[in-house]
Amino acid sequence: TWANGYDAAGQPHFDVQAANLAWQEGKVIVVQAYNTHPAPGESEAPEGFTVDKLLNGVYDAELRRFAGELRQYGKPTFFISGREPNGIGADYFGGFGPTGDKSLQWAIENKRGFAEFNPSTLPYSALYSDIGTPQVCDGVERLKAAQRYYYDFFFRREGLKFLTFDSMGWAVHQLNQIDYDVADLPATVDKTYAKQLLQSCHSFANFYPGDQYVDWVSLDFYMIDYYAKDWPGLTQDYVIPIEDHFAALDAVLREVQTVAPNKPVFFMEFGFPDGMQQSSSWAAQKITTGLSRIIAGYPQINGFAMWSGHP
C-alpha cells in the first residue's frame, strides 16, 4: 500500500501512522521520493524538476526531511525511484538536452538524443563513472544516474537499511512497438536517427543501474488491447494475441537475464484488461491463461501487484 503523498509543491510526505496500521494488517509499504520523469505538470515532483537538479543536490534538504519520516517508521519498505519511464507516453525518460529538461520528441526532432549528459562534474561523480557514453540515450542514462543517487542518498548517507529498491517498473512493450512509433513520426523527422535513439532508450541493458543499486528488478506487464475509441490517434482496433504478449515478456526477460541474472523479478504493475474494460469474457480468458502461465512457467518472477485500474 502507498504510505506517502505529495503536497502542493510536489514534495513527498510519509504518513507514519498509516504505514504502521498497514503493517499491522500485513501489507507491504511502497514509497517514492520524486518521480524521475521531468515532464511539465508532474504532480509527484516539484515544478521544474530535473534529474540534473536532483544529482546536483538541489532537493537534498527535502529528501533529508523525507528520510527522517521514513526513519520514524523503520520497517521493511519497498522504494521505487520512478514509475514506468519507458511506458506509453514516455515522452521524457530522464530528460534530454544539456540540462535534462527537454523531451524525447525534442531530442528526435533536433537529433540531440546522445552525448549531452556528462555526469563527471557532478557531486559524488564516482557513482556515475561508467555513465555518459556518447552512444547511449541520454534520457536512459539520466534514469540510471537517478537510481544510483537515490540508493546512495537513502541507504548510504541516511542509513535507511530497511529500504529495498526496485528498478522503476520497466514496461514490457510489444516486439514491434518501436517500428510503430517510428512510423507515426512526421515525414520531417530523420527516421533512421529516431529508430537508433528509440532502440537505445528502450534497452534494458542501457537502463539497468547495476546490482549494487537494485534489490528487485521490477517490470510492468499488461496484456492490454488497444481500441480506437479509447486511445486518441488510433484509427483501428488492435487486439493482441496472448502469445504475442508472452513473446514480448520473454524478450524483456532475456535482457534482464543478461545484465541481472541473480536478481529476483517482480511485476510492480500487472493486469489483463480488454482495452479499458475491467470485465469481459476476453479479459477473463487472458486472466485464466496468463496467470497460470506466469505462475507455472516463470520461476524467476517472485511476485506481482495487480493494478487496480486494470485487473
PLM regions with names:
Residues 1, 27-33, 77-81, 162-164, ...:
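Hydrophobic faces of well-ordered beta-strands that scaffold small-molecule active sites
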Residues 2-17, 37-40, 52-61, 169-179, ...:
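Acidic-and-aromatic substrate-binding clefts and catalytic sites of carbohydrate-active enzymes
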Residues 3-6, 83-84, 95-121, 129-136, ...:
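Cell-envelope and extracellular/periplasmic
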Residues 9-166, 170, 188-191, 198:
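Substrate-binding cleft of extracellular glycoside hydrolase catalytic domains
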Residues 10-20, 61-66, 174-209, 243-257, ...:
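Alpha-helical scaffolding within the catalytic cores
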Residues 13-34, 212-277:
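Glycoside hydrolase catalytic-domain groove-lining segments
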Residues 65, 70, 139-155, 234-237, ...:
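Long, well-ordered alpha-helical scaffolding segments within enzyme catalytic domains
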Residues 77, 263-311:
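Substrate-binding cleft of secreted/luminal carbohydrate-active enzymes
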